[in-house]
């Protein structure tokens, strides 16, 4: 009789920290990979919805109890992704407000991501691809990522970070400022002088 695969729910928590887009991980408490940083994940209970499982994974593995936005990204079904047996991973991207205060949390910029257990690097890469493709298409998700106020430089930085993490070519950003100017969902803020240089263009959601 074939082995029924288990269903794992894995979260990809992203947060802007120190001016960089980062992944929040927790330390594994059990084998395999005990003590190593990994994405927060749990096995789906029989009476549990996906969003409930994501929330449980975030709280139990990293202490995260709030977030700005959550969205499903992909399903990973490699039979060898977990040495303990066949599992399906249903991955969710989660945009956080801030880094959680928890000793078991490890935060890595996307540009400095180590090799994580299982297929977690692939899960992160796919989540970044989904987020990059959703910029300005999904206004709620874009707003969660950029915050209420942001600069053109912030948009450019996020685009480059996500493209690199997704394994894509560096995006063309020459016309980002012009595209922002024509977007009816945001408005340009009055420039605030900063020293002798030209102040960065700042934007706010309307």
Q: Where are the model-predicted features located?
A:
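Short, His- and charge-rich active-site/binding loops that engage polyanionic ligands
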Residues: 23, 27-30, 34, 41, ...
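Charge-enriched amphipathic alpha-helical scaffolds
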Residues: 168-190
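Active-site segment of metal-dependent pyrophosphate-handling enzymes
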Residues: 5-7, 51-55, 59-100, 134-142, ...
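NUDIX/MutT-family hydrolases
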Residues: 91-93, 100-137, 145-159, 176-179
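Short histidine-centered catalytic/ligand-binding loop motif
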Residues: 39-47, 144
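Long, intrinsically disordered, low-complexity Ser/Thr/Pro-rich regulatory/activation regions
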Residues: 186-206
């Amino acid at each position: 009789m074939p082995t029924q695969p288990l269903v794992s729910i894995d979260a990809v928590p992203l947060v802007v920290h120190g001016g960089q887009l980062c992944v929040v991980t927790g330390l594994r408490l059990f084998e395999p990979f005990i003590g190593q940083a990994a994405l927060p994940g749990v096995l789906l209970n029989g009476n549990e919805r996906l969003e409930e499982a994501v929330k449980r994974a975030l709280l139990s593995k990293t202490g995260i109890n709030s977030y700005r936005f959550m969205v499903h990204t992909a399903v990973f079904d490699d039979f060898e992704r977990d040495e303990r047996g066949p599992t399906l991973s249903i991955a969710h991207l989660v945009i956080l407000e801030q880094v959680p205060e928890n000793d078991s949390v490890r935060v890595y910029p996307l540009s400095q991501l180590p090799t994580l257990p299982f297929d977690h690097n692939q899960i992160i890469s796919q989540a970044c691809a989904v987020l990059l493709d959703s910029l300005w298409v999904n206004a709620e998700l874009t707003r969660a990522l950029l915050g209420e106020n942001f600069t053109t430089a912030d948009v450019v930085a996020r685009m480059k970070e996500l493209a690199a993490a997704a394994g894509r070519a560096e995006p063309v950003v020459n016309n980002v400022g012009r595209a922002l100017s024509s977007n009816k969902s945001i408005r340009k803020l009055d420039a605030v002088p900063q020293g002798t240089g030209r102040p960065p263009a700042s934007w706010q959601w309307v």
